[in-house]
């Protein structure tokens, strides 16, 4: 009889511990991080004068320009430029390529040389999400 009571207490304690740990694990689930990346070309790659650029976005939706929604936006490719400060509009010029239709890849043509390419994510009004939503790589165009 003593063995049975002790066994029940052990089983009850173990069950409570497992339940508590399970609940804590569920509460500790991380929120998906928001980030951007340049999936192609690879950092340090040597490419031809016309090459593919693929954008990666995590934790936000890609949507066309003009659509103002929380946690959404579209890609911009900055050529030899620093990330655009949070809240500032991404300029419209040859060094700031806009992909306002929601494109996630494109072909670009650059003359031979060394380039810094930065993916910059911005909202539907072209207002930058800042450096945390940018990624920069170096490429050599031959």
Language model features: what each stretch is:
Residues 29-48:
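Short, compositionally biased P/S/T/A/G/V-rich stretches that sit at domain boundaries
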């Amino acid at each position: 009889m003593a063995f049975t009571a002790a066994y029940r207490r052990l089983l009850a304690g173990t069950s409570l511990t497992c339940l508590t740990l399970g609940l804590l694990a569920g509460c500790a689930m991380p929120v998906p991080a928001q980030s951007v990346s340049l999936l192609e070309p690879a950092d340090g790659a040597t490419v031809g004068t016309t090459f593919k650029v693929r954008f990666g976005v995590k934790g936000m939706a890609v949507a066309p320009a003009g659509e103002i929604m929380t946690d959404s936006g579209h890609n911009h490719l900055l050529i030899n430029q620093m990330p655009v400060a949070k809240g500032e509009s991404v300029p419209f010029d040859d060094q700031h390529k806009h992909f306002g239709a929601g494109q996630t890849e494109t072909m670009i043509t650059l003359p031979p040389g060394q380039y810094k390419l930065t993916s910059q994510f911005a909202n539907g009004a072209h207002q930058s999400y800042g450096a945390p939503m940018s990624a920069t790589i170096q490429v050599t165009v031959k």
